[in-house]
From Swiss-Prot:
It comes from Mus musculus (Mouse). Homodimer. Binds specifically the SH3 domain of the protooncogene C-SRC. Residues 662-674 have a biased composition (Gly residues). This is Semaphorin-6B. Residues 32-525 form the Sema domain. Disulfide bonds join C117-C127, C145-C154, C268-C379, C293-C338, C487-C519, C528-C546, C534-C580, C538-C554. One of its GO terms (molecular function) is semaphorin receptor binding.
């Protein structure tokens, strides 16, 4: 059998893949790799805090792992908010190899609060006091809030001694119930501004103002126009407003299912709420707008998920905030850094409003002539038309309540991201910025932290022009911050333990404070010692923190340093600086575990698709060919069977005599032809009550196959005739026609009874008529109508005859039926194979009662009188019975 073989790869396929690779590089430009990758062995030199106290090298034996929630740096002191504990850690000296706490505050939940928490269905590990708010209230006071087993509580503590100051207060609307929920908080003018949830089920999201000398205010409750499942990220104070940065589901895109967008909202610090009729004890200055961080083009590519925001910094004389955005989890992985000018943010809140006139309509801008005056959202103050927000007209208050969304989005500086990283293994979620890097303090370094603790360091050069664009950012370095030997191995800590919580710059010590759930690591901002001994590498690193010293070392440069050094952050050619071993770019991509090449990924995907398509095509072709080959083999097998062993199955039974006469056995041979004795073909023709052994075992007479029925003599299908009238039993042509039709109909469901060819050689032995024959006439006379019963056959030697045999049992209850089936007499001419077996003698030829079916011409001379069928005719036609078969 032919088996297909898969052809070898053709040069055309290889050429196609190479061409595809070239096109891919053109469509997806490769992102620049870092100029340097810090070796992982440097992690062992970084100081780490894991809960160790004074005089301890490690945490106390048997102590729980840390579960850090908040980190606050105040000058040279670091406060770490943990589960049930608050630590005070001194950051000096900066050369220490271990960070230890100097003071520790244990703040556990009450047993009653824990019992209530467990009754509400929470786990034991959740019913603890997690520090979620950690703020500096004044120069000597810390404001701390904890979840307190899903019953938030807040208190004031001394910053120096961690002693409780005053009584505790409720943390509702100031601290979330669940430690997994996000929240932001800040103090401004002695008032606490928080953004969190106010209920146990985290349904009611709120921006809340409390404490201070002004009334408590909150956002409208359960209004999707104000909030729709928000996730609060950061809050900053600027001017007379407090700005909140968050992401939420956009109601203006309700026709696009759930679309997450980034927002900035603001409220006036001096807002005192609305009138008793509208917005009482609620914000009257709350407005929100969208943050636009997208790649420009015919169709903008948006980074909609806000991850982190810096404080307000000055870049080129502008108040700027930097924000990290990412794509949704079900989209192409990517992150971007966009900068926003606070002046442009404020200008958007002075623009047009957006509204939805009906729940089914889309959101459209509100015409300026429909905006009431004074402008909704403004800060009412003494000296203005309205001295306080509570004095505003109801028209303005109603407009603010129903139109909190601005029509325009806040554009990013340069209308494009400053930094874009796509197809990273982990998204960027944290950001820290140093706007005074370098010996002259005029360089801007951006540190981006990923979910797994990998930090990317970029040098950005913002343009001081009005457009606010920036030049190409330089990817300086990539380094790790998570210490698995102290913070826990990824196999045990998992992704949760390695998640980067915060990234804060400690410029005084030249380091970064990276907080993880189980540890806090201080990492230097630069590793200049890696380039010592090679001037080309030190200067080629373009790192503002590093410079080449005359003694042949690469040193760390602090702002205002007076040391002599060489540095080039512009990226000029270093060809004239000589060569040295371990060139910088030669070892860049040795261990870039956090990045994946776009070109490699796209090319591999397309190549896998092409190869899979080719293999699938060959597989389908092979299976189709296999099915065709099996079908061909099946047809050949059938033909072989018919040609060798089954020829008698398709030949006319009337030709068996010729096959026997011409076969190897001939008539007198013993073989009986190549297909065996023809009696084997006739055995299945016998029905119940007739023996097959008489044909298979033979007898004293051979079977004359020439006398078998031909297709022309095959009876026609039986057609049931209408029942004649009971009085139609008189003599005449009508009675004969009825009997003739009865005989024809009964013959169609009967067997073929054959007589041997040598029947004429046997003497005629008269036999006594059986009981059925003697009773035939009386029973037939009693019949009122013909029944579907077979006829009694009679032998006739003159020609081939077809008679009827019984095909089913007779119903003895029918008293007016025709005579029952005929049984052959027990004569000496019929031999039995056993004492009880049926006769095995060959059957004699019989005559068909339907003379119309006899084949004309060519018959042998008649040796016996024709059979008498008068007993089947209606009453009065005769009393004769059929003579027995001799």
């Amino acid at each position: 059998m032919w088996t297909p073989r898969v052809p070898p790869p053709r040069p055309a396929l290889s050429f196609f893949l190479l061409l595809l690779l070239g096109v891919t590089y053109g469509l997806f430009p490769e992102e620049p790799p870092p100029l340097s990758v810090a070796p992982r062995d440097y992690l062992s030199h970084y100081p780490v805090f894991v809960g160790s106290g004074p005089g301890r090298l490690t945490a106390a034996e048997g102590a729980e792992d840390l579960n850090i929630q908040r980190v606050l740096r105040v000058n040279r002191t670091l406060f770490i908010g943990d589960r049930d504990n608050l630590y005070q850690v001194e950051l000096e000296p900066s050369t220490s190899t271990e960070l230890r706490y100097q003071r520790k505050l244990t703040w556990r939940s009450n047993p009653s609060d824990i019992d209530v928490c467990r009754m509400k269905g929470k786990q034991e590990g959740e019913c603890r006091n997690f520090v979620k708010v950690l703020l500096l209230r004044d120069e000597s006071t810390l404001f701390v809030c904890g979840s307190n087993a899903f019953n938030p509580i807040c208190a004031n503590y001394s910053m120096d001694t961690l002693q409780l100051l005053g009584d505790s207060i409720s943390g509702m609307a100031r601290c979330p119930y669940d430690p997994k929920h996000a929240n932001v908080a800040l103090f401004s003018d002695g008032m606490l501004f928080t953004a969190t949830v106010t209920d146990f089920l985290a349904i009611d999201a709120v921006i809340y103002r409390s404490l201070g000398d002004r009334p408590t205010l909150r956002t409208v409750k359960h209004d999707s126009k104000w909030f729709k499942e928000p996730y609060f990220v950061h809050a900053v104070e600027w001017g007379s407003h407090v700005y909140f940065f968050f992401r939420e589901i956009a109601m203006e895109f309700n026709y696009l299912e759930k679309v997450v967008v980034s927002r900035v909202a603001r409220v006036c610090k001096n807002d005192v709420g609305g009138s008793p009729r509208v917005l009482e004890k609620q914000w009257t200055s709350f407005l929100k707008a969208r943050l636009n961080c997208s790649v420009p083009g015919d169709s903008h590519f948006y980074f909609n998920v806000l991850q982190a925001v810096t404080g307000v910094v000055s870049l080129g004389g502008r108040p700027v905030i930097l924000a990290v955005f990412s794509t949704p989890s079900n989209s192409i992985p990517g992150s971007a850094v966009c900068a926003f000018d606070m002046n442009q943010v404020a200008a958007v809140f002075e623009g047009r409003f957006r509204e939805q006139k009906s729940p089914e309509s889309i959101w459209t801008p509100v015409p300026e002539d429909q905006v009431p005056r004074p402008r909704p959202g403004c800060c009412a103050a003494p000296g203005m038309q309205y001295n306080a927000s509570s004095a505003l007209p109801d028209e303005i208050l109603n407009f603010v309540k129903t139109h909190p969304l601005m029509d325009e989005a806040v554009p990013s500086l340069g209308h494009s991201p400053w930094i874009v990283r796509t197809l990273m293994r982990h998204q960027l979620t944290r950001v820290a910025v140093d706007v005074g890097a370098g010996p002259w303090g005029n360089q801007t370094i951006v540190f981006l932290g990923s979910e797994a603790g990998t930090v990317l360091k970029f040098l950005v050069k913002p343009n001081a022009s009005v457009s606010g664009t920036t030049g190409p950012s330089i990817f300086l370095e990539e380094f790790e911050t998570y210490r698995p030997d102290r913070c826990g191995r990824p196999s045990s800590a998992g992704e949760w333990g390695q998640r980067l919580l915060s990234l804060e710059l400690d410029a005084a010590s030249g380091g970064l404070l990276a907080a993880f759930p189980r540890c806090v690591v201080r990492v230097p901002v630069a590793r200049c010692q890696l380039y010592s001994g090679c001037m080309k590498n030190c200067i080629g690193s373009q790192d503002p923190y590093c410079g080449w010293a005359p003694d042949g070392s690469c040193i760390f440069l602090r702002p205002g340093t007076s040391a002599t050094f060489e540095q080039d952050v512009s990226g000029a050619s270093t060809s004239g600086l000589g060569d040295c071993t371990g060139l910088l770019r030669a070892s860049l991509s040795d261990d870039r575990a956090g990045l994946v090449s776009v070109n490699l990924l796209v090319t591999s995907s397309v190549a896998a698709f092409v190869v899979g398509a080719v293999v699938s095509g060959f597989s389908v072709g092979w299976f189709v060919g296999l099915r065709e080959r099996r079908e061909l083999a099946r047809r050949k097998d059938k033909e072989a069977i018919l040609a060798h062993g089954g020829s008698e199955a398709v030949l006319s039974v009337s030709r068996l005599g010729e096959r026997r006469g011409t076969g190897p056995g001939g008539r007198g041979g013993a073989g009986g032809g190549p297909g065996g004795p023809p009696e084997a073909l006739l055995a299945p023709l016998m029905q119940n009550g007739w023996t097959k052994a008489a044909l298979l075992h033979g007898g004293p007479h051979d079977l004359d196959t020439g006398l078998l029925p031909t297709p022309e003599q095959t009876p026609l299908p039986q057609k049931r005739l209408p029942t004649p009238h009971p009085h139609a039993h008189a003599l005449g042509s009508r009675a004969w026609d009825h009997s003739h039709a009865l005989l024809s109909a009964s013959a169609s469901t009967s067997l073929l009874l054959l007589a041997p060819a040598r029947a004429s050689e046997q003497p005629q032995v008269p036999a006594e008529p059986g009981p059925e024959s003697r009773l035939c006439a009386p029973r037939s006379c009693r019949a009122s109508h013909p029944g579907d019963f077979p006829l009694t056959p009679h032998a006739s030697p003159d020609r081939r005859r077809v008679v009827s045999a019984p095909t089913g049992p007779l119903d003895p209850s029918v008293g007016d039926g025709l005579p029952g089936p005929w049984s052959p007499p027990a004569t000496s001419s019929l031999r039995r194979p056993g004492p009880h077996g049926p006769p095995t003698a060959a059957l004699r030829r019989t005559h068909t009662f339907n003379s119309g079916e006899a084949r004309p011409g060519g018959h042998r001379p008649r040796r016996h009188p024709p059979a008498d069928s008068t007993h089947l005719l209606p009453c009065g036609t005769g009393e004769r019975t059929a003579p027995p078969v001799p």
